[in-house]
Amino acid sequence: MVVELVFRILLGGSYFQDKQSKLSDDRAKGYMTNSDLEKAVKEFGRRCSNISRIYSIGKSVHGVPLWVIEISDKPGEEEPEPAFKFVGNVHGDEPVGRELLLRLANWICDNYIKDSLARLIVENIHLHILPSMNPDGYFLRRRGNANNIDLNRDFPDQFFPVNNDINARQPETRAVMNWLREMQFAGSASLHGGALVANYPWDGTEDKRRNYYACPDDDTFRFMASIYSHSHHNMSLSTEFPGGITNGALWYPIYGGMQDWNYIHAGCFELTLEISDNKWPNANEIPTLWEYNKMSLLNLAASLVKTGIHGRIFSSDSGMPLPGSITIKGINYTKLVADGVNIYHGKQIIVLFLPCIKKSLKSM
């Protein structure tokens, strides 16, 4: 007994790390490994090839592909339809999102012929699902990536940018940034764990104080967050967060977050969804968490069709897209429309400007 105790003391950290590793392995039982996830994504692509395509937006530090599932009746084609994305596993130790997003994809595939909501999404939206943004962090059972960087603090920030050069970012961050530069998303949500609330911009304040800091589209973001919370089993009943929603800066300010970057740099309305009180619950809780969040995920994506403006502007003579811009009155927002437009700003007055046409003021 004494010998064993001395042996453990001499080993010090390695004994503790081995014990921690075993605990982490036990916690991960029932969850997909990165290899399992890749197989599941590719199997989905084969099984549901008529309404999907599989692609990668890049690789993690350790070279793991960041797989995306696109769901649409015309996957990979450019259409005058809005695009929405879900991003899971931003933090490696918050894996519920990666499990739920695969279930979401499979549920839509299994039900889009017989379920009106699934059919609405397939026929009217391009839904993109990135189950795991941080596969290395998941493998290491920790929040940060392989370089131990918190990816949700790694994006250029409006107040405290460390470096706005995309090349200075982590590979996973760069992949997401390039993704949004190549593709136009109207809405988005990232899935996290450790609380139960739908969080919306702004996430930070200029003076770093904790208070409500509204973005120009505060009403629309509150509407989106409420769709999620009120479609959820019990999120809207929260005693900590009225209605199950919160302004990020009021909860706790963060800087370098993906949510604010989406809104500022890509015109994409992103929520941060905390979907489980426990960051890494036992795997036997996943079916219940899926049932609690299923309608919220579906209704949030479907809200793009039920609200907002989306389409393209063509010349009636040539059929070619026309260059122009859209301005929303009362909001400091101008969007180029040559490649199509998806706008998700609630009830507003829209002004369309086409430089090739003298009378180009249109209100909608």
Where do the model's predicted regions map?
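Short, surface-exposed beta-strand/loop micro-motifs that present aromatic residues
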Residues: L66-G76, M258-I264
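Short, Gly/Ser/Thr-enriched beta-strand-loop segments that form substrate-interacting elements
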Residues: Y55, F241-I264
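A short, solvent-exposed loop/turn motif at the edges and junctions
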Residues: I350-M364
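Short glycine- and acidic-rich boundary segments immediately preceding or forming the N-terminal edge
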Residues: L10-P65
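Short, acidic Ser/Thr/Gly-rich low-complexity loop/linker segments typical of extracellular
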Residues: L322-I349
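Beta-strand-rich domain onsets/edges
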Residues: P281, I286-G308
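Active-site/substrate-binding loop(s) of hydrolase catalytic cores
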Residues: E78-S226, H230-T239, N262-Y263, E270-I275
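A short, amphipathic beta-strand motif
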Residues: I309-S316
